[in-house]
């Protein structure tokens, strides 16, 4: 099980006018283990990944901690042997020798009726979405 921690406060404040996008807090990400190169950043796509989410956004009727499926999501593992000075916040800074913590949020292009489990990912706020095992 891979867990993701983040704080959306500043991003929500920055993007409050982006209705009808829905802001959610990702509590836990369940993913099959995949081999990866531990020496550099890389990307891959996860399909039918199960997310446990808690909504924090506008006009959102989703029940907190309900499980939904994101049908396609591309993310980046930030695995670097050093802490880059290029990134000054933890959303973009890798922890030395491990997968890093991140500050990020997802928003979606459409909101289905309550009970629907189909969402399409639109964009993510951070250029590097990092997960800590």
Curated annotation (Swiss-Prot):
At the top level, the lineage of the source is Eukaryota
What name has this protein been given in UniProt? Putative uncharacterized protein YBR134W
Fill in the misc note: Partially overlaps YBR133C.
